[in-house]
């Protein structure tokens, strides 16, 4: 690879002419095909034959990172538009091109058959194409990566990478080998797998990439492509007021995923008693979408221009995440800010840490009741000057949060940015470098005849996810009847997940090799828990 291309891929901040970019892309693709064709030996997987179709089909299941966005405006696809799911899209050049991460610190000259192997347990996510094995050159060192599970017991297989949403305690690879670490990639909602929100579940992993800033490789700002995204101009006040006069409510709600742990509809239902809200999605729907084409895609993630123009007319957007957890923030928050609507937000309790300034969103939980919130919104609706104070972050110099600014500056991956690697390849390299330095440390320790200090284990902590038990969107759990579907579904799911983490931990501790015994362990865990109560 030419130095110029390496810089392009790694540096990401340089400005290059389009033709240079293109030739680098072509060169990289060619190199990549060569690398894939190079034979690998010694037990590492070198398996072709998984068809392109299968690869894309698999990835297709992961196309929609924010589970609420059920519909996709595929016919209006705009390649330039922001899709944080770029990591999953095999057709995205960004994924293909920027998957080499070799940094100036990497002087690794080992051949493929000497390199440690990282196994992607969730093969749908394997961020390489074509083939199912690949050499990766990372900032500090190199590894082989594969999705072929036949290497799972190999002594060179040093780490297994799991996708949180697909991780099933009853399908985990057993026995767990002492020389292997487990790595977790989970950028999606905590509701997709509550096992990871409990200590016994998260501690199964050594390295994590989650939405939490506390994880080893944080993906917290995955839905914010750039700071400039926030500075997109809002519709004028006059125009917004005109839409109000034309019969638009001050507040927009657009959600089609209704039975979620945050139980948001229970709150919205109360709020609607005191405040005009236009609801177009399947949840609490009270209006027909004026545009037939957008009707069944009203919760789309894409930045379809018509969809965006329509939603920008509203002064306020109800921005409620499907689950409540520190640092879990999605497009529900960032998109209204991009459009210049004020988010009325409930989701990450620590959301303020990431806001462009101290006066840019309205937090639902700052208000004692839906009625008080409604009164506040109505005041702002009739006071343009007070309203506009919430958009000052869009003015030059208006984005003052240095934590936000520096976090964006420091992040090494890009969102739909062809010049920066995506976070799947980034995390893979993070694990590769960690494993190589662990191998080195273990060798040094052995040579020292146990003289020095043994390398410390690295184990994920509760706060790498740590999402709290779901609570009702409005009122208290005691007031809600046992027959309520939210109560039946999410409280059970949450606590059953705790038991799953404990059961798997017990299986690992006892060197269990038979996955089928998982439910016996679950039963045992359940009995133990009932006895302790
Ligand atoms: C995985 O690799 C082994 C050995 O290299 C090979 O025999 C097998 O067919 C591969 N499996 C898949 C699913 O490609
Ligand atoms: C927000 O206000 C607090 C104190 O009121 C201050 O410490 C903090 O720096 C402010 N943050 C921003 C982004 O202005
Ligand atoms: C990985 O985590 C497990 C606990 O799940 C721990 O027993 C092991 O020592 C850790 N391995 C390393 C290399 O840190
Ligand atoms: C599990 O295996 C490890 C080493 O392979 C051994 O040290 C440990 O005692 C075993 N544990 C049980 C409960 O058999």
UniProtKB/Swiss-Prot annotation:
User: Could you tell me the keywords of this UniProt record?
Assistant: Disulfide bond, Endoplasmic reticulum, Glycoprotein, Glycosyltransferase, Membrane, Signal-anchor, Transferase, Transmembrane, Transmembrane helix
Q: In which pathway does it act?
A: Protein modification; protein glycosylation
Entry protein name: GDP-fucose protein O-fucosyltransferase 4
Q: Which SUPFAM superfamilies does the entry link to?
A: UDP-Glycosyltransferase/glycogen phosphorylase
**How does it sit in the bilayer?**
Single-pass type II membrane protein
Q: What class of enzyme is it?
A: transferase
Q: Which residues lie on this side of the membrane: Cytoplasmic?
A: 1-20
**What Gene Ontology molecular function terms does this protein carry?**
alpha-(1->3)-fucosyltransferase activity; peptide-O-fucosyltransferase activity
Q: Which reaction does it catalyse?
A: L-threonyl-[protein] + GDP-beta-L-fucose = 3-O-(alpha-L-fucosyl)-L-threonyl-[protein] + GDP + H(+); L-seryl-[protein] + GDP-beta-L-fucose = 3-O-(alpha-L-fucosyl)-L-seryl-[protein] + GDP + H(+)
* Cystine connections: 429-432
What's the name of its gene?
A: fut11
Give the Enzyme Commission number.
2.4.1.221
Q: Where in the cell is it found?
A: Endoplasmic reticulum membrane
Species: Xenopus tropicalis
